């Protein structure tokens, strides 16, 4: 699931961005990191996503029971759009950690010096070296459907996101993690979902605390995930959004957060002049790589593109997409596309694997294949999202 980090760093100079929020916001530039030896795997991406949603809710814990501003955190495109991560500072003095920003979960956990089997290449948080760390006393454990897991203890410390300093944030210190987590480019996960699905009940997420501590002017965050073909990278803006990153106007869509996710309704799907599906539910998930559709929808889409079912959730598709029409979803009062150049995710010699797949769920998971083509503003308070095509 996670990838071996054999990387070269390419520093990018980021242009100053015009953000829609208070002018006191801070911005952080992050280099683009690529693993030139990595081979994208559609099969692994499908398995990772399905394992993630299978585990809800197979979690356990020992006790389950104003300055306005914006902060922006650029994110790194980890080789061919396989994973985006941002840098977060934890503790005093701070240690900088690469974390997977994930709207499909709500936990903030990362490798620590208490971990007996964490990857040797991972930067580890040391609670004994932070003057602002405090013990919590509770434990946490996450088990995924594919058998991978992470577990450890809870504490509180100062967490800084894009220049915004959250005090007394509950953090989950990993004491053990499965081998699938040990070699990836990120050292943990920062969940941006709703607090109803935190592993330990009652824990407030970083977004909760950004709002309650008055660190952001609006209860929103804008997400831009850049394509590797356009230089990669991307950015999260907490408390605002970047109007230069999208074209046209934002379409507002209500969110169903009853399961702790950013759930929306897809009214229909078209390819060219052909309607290929009626309505279905979907989750907007920055922590999932592919576009995972309900089985019947995926089958109809695959037929339209002449793709072949591999029996493992993936499809083989023609490597030449020049004649393909975009995959178009009707959402709210607008339509949003996955263009032809995003329909191929992985190429193995003369064989190509599609950027869409399927699972055993009756809902879709709109991962990075959709999100890197459409700018999204997440509003936790209403709740709602606003979407527009990328510029």
From Swiss-Prot:
Residues 1-21 form the signal peptide. SUPFAM superfamilies: Acid proteases. GO terms for molecular function: aspartic-type endopeptidase activity. Gene3D superfamilies: Acid Proteases. Disulfide bonds join 115-118, 319-352. Keywords: Aspartyl protease, Disulfide bond, Hydrolase, Protease, Signal, Zymogen. PROSITE patterns: ASP_PROTEASE (PS00141), PEPTIDASE_A1 (PS51767). GO terms for biological process: proteolysis. It comes from the Eukaryota. Pfam families: Asp. The active site is at 102, 285. The keyword Hydrolase applies. It catalyses: Hydrolysis of proteins with broad specificity similar to that of pepsin A, preferring hydrophobic residues at P1 and P1'. Clots milk and activates trypsinogen. Does not cleave 4-Gln-|-His-5, but does cleave 10-His-|-Leu-11 and 12-Val-|-Glu-13 in B chain of insulin. Residues 22-68 form a propeptide. Residues 84-388 form the Peptidase A1 domain. It is an enzyme of class 3 (hydrolase). PANTHER family: ASPARTYL PROTEINASE, BETA-SITE APP-CLEAVING ENZYME, ISOFORM A-RELATED. Belongs to the peptidase A1 family. This is Rhizopuspepsin-2. It comes from Rhizopus niveus.
């Amino acid at each position: 699931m996670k990838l071996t980090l054999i990387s070269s760093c390419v520093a990018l100079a980021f242009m100053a961005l015009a953000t829609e929020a208070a002018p006191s916001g801070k911005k952080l530039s992050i280099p683009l990191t690529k693993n030139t030896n990595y081979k994208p795997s559609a099969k692994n991406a499908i398995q990772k996503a399905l394992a993630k949603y299978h585990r809800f809710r197979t979690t356990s814990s020992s006790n389950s029971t104003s300055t306005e501003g914006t902060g922006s955190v650029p994110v790194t495109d980890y080789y061919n759009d396989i994973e985006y991560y941002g840098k977060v500072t934890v503790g005093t003095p701070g240690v900088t950690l690469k974390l997977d920003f994930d709207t499909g979960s709500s936990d903030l956990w990362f490798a620590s010096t208490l971990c007996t089997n964490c990857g040797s290449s991972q930067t580890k948080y040391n609670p004994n070296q932070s003057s602002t760390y405090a013990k919590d006393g509770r434990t946490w454990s996450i088990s995924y459907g594919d058998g991978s897991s992470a577990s450890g203890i809870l504490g509180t410390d100062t967490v800084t996101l894009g220049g915004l300093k959250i005090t007394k944030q509950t953090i989950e210190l990993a004491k053990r993690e499965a081998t699938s987590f040990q070699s990836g480019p990120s050292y943990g996960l920062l969940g941006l979902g709703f607090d109803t699905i935190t592993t330990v009940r009652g824990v407030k997420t970083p977004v909760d605390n950004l709002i309650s501590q008055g660190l952001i002017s609006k209860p929103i965050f804008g997400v831009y995930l850049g394509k590797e073909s356009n230089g990669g990278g991307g950015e999260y803006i907490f408390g605002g959004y970047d109007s230069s990153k999208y074209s046209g106007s934002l379409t507002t869509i209500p969110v169903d957060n009853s399961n702790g996710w950013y759930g929306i309704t897809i009214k229909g799907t078209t390819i060219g002049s052909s309607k290929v599906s009626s309505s279905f539910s979907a989750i907007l998930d920055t922590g999932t790589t592919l576009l995972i559709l309900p089985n019947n929808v995926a089958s109809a889409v695959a037929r339209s593109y002449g793709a072949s079912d591999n029996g493992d959730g993936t499809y083989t598709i023609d490597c030449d997409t020049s004649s393909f029409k975009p995959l178009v979803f009707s959402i709210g009062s607008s339509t949003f596309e996955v263009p032809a150049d995003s329909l191929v995710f992985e190429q193995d010699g003369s064989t190509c694997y599609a950027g869409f797949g399927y699972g055993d769920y009756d809902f879709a998971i709109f991962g990075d294949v959709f999100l890197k083509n459409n700018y999204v503003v997440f509003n936790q308070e209403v709740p709602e999202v606003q979407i527009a095509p990328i510029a």
